[in-house]
A protein has these predicted regions:
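Short, Lys/Arg-enriched anionic-surface-contact patches
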Residues: 1-3
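Helix-turn-helix
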Residues: 6, 10, 14-56
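Solvent-exposed, amphipathic alpha-helical segments
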Residues: 6, 10-17, 64-71, 108-111, ...
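Short alpha-helical functional segments enriched in proximate histidine and acidic residues
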Residues: 14, 60, 136-140
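Hydrophobic/aromatic residues within well-ordered alpha-helical segments
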Residues: 46, 53, 57, 61, ...
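Amphipathic alpha-helical packing segments from all-alpha helical-bundle domains
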Residues: 78, 100-149
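C-terminal peripheral helix-coil segments that are non-catalytic and often amphipathic
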Residues: 86-90, 134-170
């Protein structure tokens, strides 16, 4: 492990799948194969480490990038619906594809629980990002169709599907 971003990337699955309260620095050392000194060099404590994980790995994926917004704003309505992923789907796919999390749908719920417990303003930051997302979707879709898209229904159905996926009925 060479740098700060490597430590964050190795710790993110721990946050997504575990209880931050129960994870000790010694556990982090073992899991990411780094010494306490290397971790402390970049992060003064667990709270700082957690905040950096959320700020640098969770929120950037939860929010649509400017490039994604640009592409979606130019898409046809059917392409928009085929390409658009809710913030929850973006997090789920990122956890699965980039971090190898086995049950990323379950991990989403855990991230929200951990974030609301250990990150000041987590809930309000998520709310602000969701409002930006809804405003963006309303501008894109609202200008192209006559009927009103019930954004709350879209998100409720999406969260319901992710919840069912998280149940791991295998």
């Amino acid at each position: 492990m060479k740098n700060r971003s490597d430590i964050l990337k190795k710790c993110y699955p721990l946050v997504a799948t575990g209880s931050w309260d129960a994870i000790a620095i010694s556990d982090i050392e073992k899991d990411i194969k780094q010494t306490r000194g290397a971790i402390a060099y970049y992060f003064k404590n667990k709270k700082t480490l957690f905040a950096n994980i959320i700020d640098e790995l969770f929120f950037p994926v939860f929010a649509l990038s400017d490039d994604e917004r640009e592409k979606l704003s130019k898409a046809t309505v059917s392409d928009f619906y085929n390409k658009y992923k809710t913030p929850f789907e973006q997090i789920r796919d990122d956890l699965r594809d980039n971090y190898g999390v086995e049950n990323p749908s379950q991990a989403i719920f855990n991230l929200f629980i951990q974030g609301s417990k250990h990150y000041d303003q987590f809930t309000s930051n998520v709310g602000e990002l969701m409002q930006l997302e809804q405003d963006f979707m309303s501008r894109i879709v609202g200008g192209r169709v006559n009927n009103i898209l019930d954004l709350n229904r879209v998100y409720v159905e999406n969260i319901g599907n992710i919840f069912i996926e998280s149940m791991n009925f295998d």
